[in-house]
Amino acid sequence: MHGKVPTLQDVVLELTPQTEIDLQCNEQLDSSEDEDEDEVDHLQERPQQARQAKQHTCYLIHVPCCECKFVVQLDIQSTKEDLRVVQQLLMGALTVTCPLCASSN
């Protein structure tokens, strides 16, 4: 481009297609049946761990920040018994700080 104002003659458009790109992939995926069998075998090998995993539940706990009283959400995955321990800690001396107050300290 020459000059202060571009003109149509200054703009060069080259709309030639690039060399063709092969978009085909020769990769083969494993069948999902094998994965399902592995998962079943995994559960049969460790039944105690499988039972424990089923007992864990996700809980949302809303706790006010100890500095600014902004509500902080805690996502906890635990058993009911462990949730009671967390509840006792939060009712006692344990405090929670929001990210803004934590970064300013």
From Swiss-Prot:
Region of interest: E7 terminal domain: 1-45
Motif (LXCXE motif): 23-27
Classification via Pfam families: E7 (PF00527)
Compartment(s): Host cytoplasm; Host nucleus
Zinc finger map (unnamed): 65-101
Keywords: Activator, DNA-binding, Early protein, G1/S host cell cycle checkpoint dysregulation by virus, Host cytoplasm, Host nucleus, Host-virus interaction, Inhibition of host innate immune response by virus, Inhibition of host interferon signaling pathway by virus, Interferon antiviral system evasion, Metal-binding, Modulation of host cell cycle by virus, Oncogene, Transcription, Transcription regulation, Viral immunoevasion, Zinc, Zinc-finger
Single Gene Ontology MF annotation: DNA binding
Residue ranges of the motif Nuclear export signal: 83-91
Family (UniProt): Belongs to the papillomaviridae E7 protein family.
Subunit structure: Homodimer. Homooligomer. Interacts with host RB1; this interaction induces dissociation of RB1-E2F1 complex thereby disrupting RB1 activity. Interacts with host EP300; this interaction represses EP300 transcriptional activity. Interacts with protein E2; this interaction inhibits E7 oncogenic activity. Interacts with host TMEM173/STING; this interaction impairs the ability of TMEM173/STING to sense cytosolic DNA and promote the production of type I interferon (IFN-alpha and IFN-beta).
Protein name according to UniProt: Protein E7
Species whose genome carries this gene: Human papillomavirus 56
